Amino acid sequence: MSGKAGFTPEDPEDSDNRHGNPLFEGIFTALNWMTVLPVPGASVFDRTTGARVMASLPFVGFVFGMFTAIIMWAIGPISGVIHVDGLLVAVLIVAFWELLNRFMHLDGLADVSDALGSYAAPPRAREILADPRTGLFGLATAMLSVLLQVAAVASLVDSTVWWMICFIPVLGRIAGQVTALKNHNAFSPTGFGALVIGTVKFWWIALWLLVTAALAFWCAELISPLSPLTSVNTPFVAGPFPAAINPAWLGGWVAITAVVACVFAALFSRRLSRSFGGLNGDCIGACIHLGASISAVMFAVVANAMV
């Protein structure tokens, strides 16, 4: 992730004229940088571009969520003819997420894990972070994070809260925004991290949390609990969680999960900053992937509690 983009030479007096509309430039460049979608991005890379991309990062998560819903509904008719195991669907969904972002965040998680697991001083840790080879720590952490997501999604696909799967990529990317808050610094003056770290304002995160919570409440109230992979509409039943009694509570659980993911990202970012003497793009990718894994597990807890 740290090598995805870097600063472009530019005339400071002409900088504003080389940028496009803030909203569209942020959204399109975020999709260009963070996915394999053939979307045109910005023509100039600087801190302004980086800030606009980070402000739009959760939108990329909503695009992932939209594609996830399409996959679920596309597999639905097939499951009506032949049995499609929930685990297989979960593997397909998680694999799709990774392919859509070119394994970028997973690569960042692996790099960060190798560097963090070395317990080396910041200069040496940064060298390990830049090493393209993956060690045991990186491989194990990446594997466990993916397995957590697959297991959690498998619990959700046949449940009455299947739609929560679509929010997992969103919450991961909101957690990624936390890593680039203004109180953080990049350890290198060049590269992707220098473009984006320290550009995010707290109110951006708060706004995305409100938008996500509102959409989650809408889904809990209006979307049928019938999973596209289930032939019978399973009613909400009494269980250990209030969500099993009041569907609207599910929206609150999504909001709580988002806050938990953000708190984790804040604490983890501080730890990484101390270990590396700053942050880079790999640190953002690691927080995105781990934030998504935490969100997936918390959603699965609700799904299992409602059985």
UniProtKB/Swiss-Prot annotation:
Its chief place of residence is: membrane
Q: In which pathway does it act?
A: Cofactor biosynthesis; adenosylcobalamin biosynthesis; adenosylcobalamin from cob(II)yrinate a,c-diamide: step 7/7
Q: Which reaction does it catalyse?
A: alpha-ribazole + adenosylcob(III)inamide-GDP = adenosylcob(III)alamin + GMP + H(+); alpha-ribazole 5'-phosphate + adenosylcob(III)inamide-GDP = adenosylcob(III)alamin 5'-phosphate + GMP + H(+)
Output one GO BP term: cobalamin biosynthetic process
Give the signal sequence positions: none
Transmembrane feature ranges:
22-42, 58-78, 80-100, 137-157, 161-181, 212-232, 248-268, 283-303
EC number, UniProt record: 2.7.8.26
Q: What is this protein called?
A: Adenosylcobinamide-GDP ribazoletransferase
Q: Which organism is it from?
A: Corynebacterium glutamicum (strain ATCC 13032 / DSM 20300 / JCM 1318 / BCRC 11384 / CCUG 27702 / LMG 3730 / NBRC 12168 / NCIMB 10025 / NRRL B-2784 / 534)
